[in-house]
Amino acid sequence: MESSLKIKDIPQNERPKEKLLTYGAESLSNSELLAIIIRTGTQGENVLQLCSRLLSELEGLNGILDASFDDIISIKGIKQGKASQILALAELFKRFRTLKAINNDIKITSPKDLASLLMGEMNELNQEVLKVVLLNTKNIVVGIKDVFKGSLNTSVVHPREIFKQAISKNSASIIICHNHPSGDPTPSREDINITLRIKECGNIIGIQLVDHIIIGNNKFVSLKERGLI
């Protein structure tokens, strides 16, 4: 039966590692690429089947990037070792994405510039994530950091965590950005209150909050453009 098919029982030219060596990494599916990282399956399920189910349960690559250790380890067949491998891979991807933005000297001249930079990543996240985008005196991105995950409110969003990142990079100004998993980027009263609190703290320490961008389903709202900050 297919459910008990082992990798060694799959024709050699169809195995992920052999396909990569023969045709290149770009020829592999997401589950095949992940299978090369994870390497082994579980009883009654080979590594390809495990990775396919993992991607399905986490709703794709965006889900993996958004997942916590507890999210991953709750999936049948995933133990600490495999969960650690997946989290390490996700973190490397996040760091590469940030380095790419920094090395390309991306300049933010409008809310659309920032939305274009982050929308692909944040569009399909399953929970709210608040990022701080760090800018130099020329409005060029020098860093992008995740600072909070989960439902955002003034009791959990601490300005010190945001400005700690800015100070460490000698940032002249910052933009904060978060997503609404509902797909509707309309700012809530809590969103506005958080923004005003961060703006006030920035004024005190001399690091300007330029804007707060909220991303929904292929659309965004700038609180600055709406006159809310």
Swiss-Prot record:
GO terms classed as biological process: proteolysis
Family: Belongs to the UPF0758 family.
Pfam family, one: UPF0758_N
Keywords: Hydrolase, Metal-binding, Metalloprotease, Protease, Zinc
SUPFAM superfamilies membership: JAB1/MPN domain (SSF102712)
Motif JAMM motif: positions: 178-191
GO molecular function, a single term: metal ion binding
Entry keyword Transmembrane helix: no
PANTHER family in alphabetical order: DNA REPAIR PROTEIN RADC, UPF0758 PROTEIN YEES-RELATED
UniProt domain MPN: residue ranges: 107-229
Record's keyword annotation contains rRNA processing: no
InterPro entries, A to Z: MPN, RadC_JAB, UPF0758, UPF0758_CS, UPF0758_N
Chain sites annotated for binding Zn(2+): H178, H180, D191
Listed name of the protein: UPF0758 protein Cbei_0490
Tree of life domain: Bacteria
CDD domains (alphabetical): MPN_DUF2466 (cd08071)
